Amino acid sequence: APLEPVYPGDDATPEQMAQYAAELRRYINMLTRPRYGKRDEEDLLDLKCSSLHAAAPRELSPMGA
């Protein structure tokens, strides 16, 4: 994983802040970029539905008598 850029401090020059902003943008893009090929959409949909079901509170789940 890429390293998070270090904040240059409140007394940094505008150039340092601009460089930090650019590095931070690159870092966030690396972490949040979509990863294709791991699962197809149907599997992802099944995964979302099953995790929603698993996360439902027990009170809402049907109880066997």
Curated annotation (Swiss-Prot):
Superkingdom per UniProt: Eukaryota
Residues with Tyrosine amide modification: Y36
Molecular function (Gene Ontology), one example: neuropeptide Y receptor binding
GO biological process: feeding behavior; neuropeptide signaling pathway
Keywords noted in UniProt: Amidation, Hormone, Secreted
Propeptide: 59-65
Gene Ontology cellular-component terms listed: extracellular space
Localization per record: Secreted
Induction: Induced in hypoglycemia, and, in vitro, by carbocal, in fetal pancreatic cells.
Record has Secreted as a keyword: yes
InterPro entries the record matches: Pancreatic_hormone-like, Pancreatic_hormone-like_CS
Keyword 4Fe-4S: no
PANTHER family associated with the record: NEUROPEPTIDE Y/PANCREATIC HORMONE/PEPTIDE YY, PANCREATIC POLYPEPTIDE PROHORMONE
Assigned protein family: Belongs to the NPY family.
Record's miscellaneous remark: May be used as a marker of the viability of xenotransplanted fetal panreatic tissue in the immediate post-transplant period.
Name this protein carries in UniProt: Pancreatic polypeptide prohormone
UniProt source species: Sus scrofa (Pig)
